Amino acid sequence: MAGSQRLKRMADSVQRELSELIRQELKDPRLGGLVTISAVKVSADMGYAEVYVTVMGRELGDEQSEAANKETLDVLNKASGFLRHELSRRIKTRITPRLRFHYDKTNAYGNYMFGLIEKAVQDLPEQSSEDKS
């Protein structure tokens, strides 16, 4: 149980510090919109951290957005060495995990589903007050 608490604390620290680092230190114009870290999962040996990111303002299924998301991941994965080095300066641990970035589609998928529900509700025929009784 203590090990899982330690991993959770490490994941929280990595998420907090990486958010700041990406916002303040990465000046690559290919990053585009607001990059947010939705989750971090640290391996049991703390050797790796799976970092899940989202980019605000991009829709699911849009080909341009998919290409931009891939480019964002490429930029983040190429900067992972720099980010890891900076992370090691901010988080004082014996091991700083290697970073692997993944695009988190849950937020975009939720927005997509919400749009489908809204469209379905709008397409419903108007019910008169007689039908409701």
From Swiss-Prot:
Keywords: Cytoplasm, Ribosome biogenesis
UniProt-annotated location(s): Cytoplasm
InterPro entries with a match to the protein in the record: KH_dom-like_a/b (IPR015946), RbfA (IPR000238), RbfA_dom_sf (IPR023799)
Gene3D superfamilies, sorted: 3.30.300.20
GO molecular function: ribosomal small subunit binding
Cited NCBIfam families: PRK13816.1 (NF010389), rbfA (TIGR00082)
Subunit structure: Monomer. Binds 30S ribosomal subunits, but not 50S ribosomal subunits or 70S ribosomes.
Protein name: Ribosome-binding factor A
Organism: Acinetobacter baylyi (strain ATCC 33305 / BD413 / ADP1)
Gene: rbfA
